[in-house]
């Protein structure tokens, strides 16, 4: 009986780890990202919605709060460059020059929120 229940827990547990992984990490990431967000360039008003309040300084909060496209408040390059430790000026310049070194920059506007979150988790971990 114990074997059955152990196997029964593993079966549903195996295909599910990925979705709950980013869902569970979201709150924790949100806190860490909000901290990094303020530490970088966000004017403190950015932690939650990051809409137009921080148009150029909201790096990490983008995949957490802004919608998939992050078109207005959070620059597309934010989530990909911020975790790499670039300064706001650096990643902004990188955005303007259109450098392809940050291939992940397009993920924010193209991929789903889950993809963005998973990408961010991998970058931060």
UniProtKB/Swiss-Prot annotation:
Compositionally biased residues, Low complexity: 109-118
Biased composition (Polar residues): 98-108
Domain of life where this protein originates: Eukaryota
Sorted UniProt keywords: Repeat
Region named Disordered: 1-27, 81-125
Protein name: Uncharacterized protein GAS8-AS1
Taxonomic source organism: Homo sapiens (Human)
